[in-house]
């Protein structure tokens, strides 16, 4: 879960695809 937050800072919400790829 913490990793998701870190990625949210690096990638804007527009890149929500990145979050799904990691998860």
From Swiss-Prot:
Protein name according to UniProt: Gastrin-releasing peptide
Modified sites of kind Methionine amide: 23
Primary role: Stimulates the release of gastrin and other gastrointestinal hormones.
Lineage, highest ranks first: Eukaryota, Metazoa, Chordata, Craniata, Vertebrata
Entry-linked InterPro entries: Bombesin
Keyword Secreted (UniProt): yes
GO CC annotation, single: extracellular space
One GO process term, biological-process aspect: neuropeptide signaling pathway
UniProt keywords, alphabetically: Amidation, Cytoplasmic vesicle, Secreted
Subcellular location: Secreted; Cytoplasmic vesicle, Secretory vesicle lumen
Keyword Phosphoprotein set for record: no
A Pfam family per the record: Bombesin
Annotated family: Belongs to the bombesin/neuromedin-B/ranatensin family.
